[in-house]
Amino acid sequence: MDTSPKNIAVIGSGVTGLGAAWALSRNHHVSLLERDTRLGGHARTIDVTMGEKLVPVDTGFIVFNHRNYPNLTNLFDTLDVATEATDMSFSVKSGRYEFAPTPGALLGDPRHITSRRTWAILRGINRFRKQVAGYETIPNPDDTLIDFLRGGHYPEPFITDYLLPLAAAVWSGAGTDAASMPVGTFLHFLSNHGLFEIERPRWRTVSGGSREYVERIAKEIPQVRTGVNVTAVARAPDGVEVTTPDGPEFYDEVVLATHAPQTLRLLGDDAREEERSILGAFRYAPNRAVVHRDASVMPRRKAAWSAWNAVGTPPGSAQPISVTYWMNRLQNLDPNHDVFITLNPGTDPEQIIDDIWYAHPQFNPDTDRAQQRLPEIQGRDGIWYCGAWTGYGFHEDGLQSGLTVAAALGSPAPWHDSITPATPAAIHSARSQTLAGA
């Protein structure tokens, strides 16, 4: 393989692009191009007033753990990024009903002892855990999750008041789309890495917010250009042409660290049939994230307040499941000044501090097949594809994807040979395991 330094453009500065550009910079001449005026993608930190202080609060990427995020852990260690322990408790409310799968929350409300709804949820949890353990033997793994649950006569409270809200917490608000996921995929990531292990992953958050790692990694990439609106990427006789409003630029290789639909738009008429088929399989759902101080979105009983708090909706509802993150608990903030982030609020909360939209990939049998076909187009004519969409949409998925491309171009991460990359399923089963209180 040719190991001489190449002129490479990385388009997109989320964790995927940052990781790819950082690793590639060790052996190549790299230009990181970002349309926005800031770097980081979902790694976005804002300053919130708490008393007399401005405190950093994350609005996108918030938590990770050492066991299931090996690349992210190694990156943080390499960059000397400080992290701290966090809490991953979970609650659901539906109307006046509130449920949190912890002894304190259940026993703290005597109504749960005689509630048919609560007992239906607990029976469903117990039965579903057994189903997860035997996921490899289910007869129709391509059935949707909701069809599997309804066909298996699972209690409706378990579906609407527990499992789908749990999925919404795991997938950043996209619980209604989780209902359409292949049940085999869903059960697999719940089972992988031991859903029923007593020793659960210990979750952590970046001290000072995720911008700490973004700023540190950016300093190690020699050429970073923000505010560059790339409008097209096309194959050229001697490389790849990148078009911006300032004119064309030419590179030996181009790494597209963008959402799949954005990638397809950049290729435009130059996209081949295989690229249209693979990249065109992915759809994204918009999720609104509102940072605020309105405690009315939380459970009525303070004892039920958790790090992650979901509001259930019936499957198929036009309204996405709403999830509220209690940032004081997640990021160890001053308990005297509550700050919340609500995804997809049904009505606007009071005391809004910040309002932003994120997009998350939606997964189904078509995307599963598209992911398996990615090697068909990877690296052909100097164009490379990466992003969290190549896994299950999480930070480790994105970083692993970018580092995989860098390694293929002869510039692996320094820890490349010392870890076994986490599968997407392992990442999500760990998060689900913790939220479920297994």
Regions found by a protein language model. Name each.
Residues 46-72:
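N-terminal glycine-rich dinucleotide-binding loop that anchors FAD/FMN and/or NAD(P) in oxidoreductases
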Residues 187-244, 249:
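Helical element adjacent to the flavin cofactor pocket in flavoenzyme catalytic cores
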Residues 231-232, 236-359:
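Mid-domain catalytic core of redox enzymes
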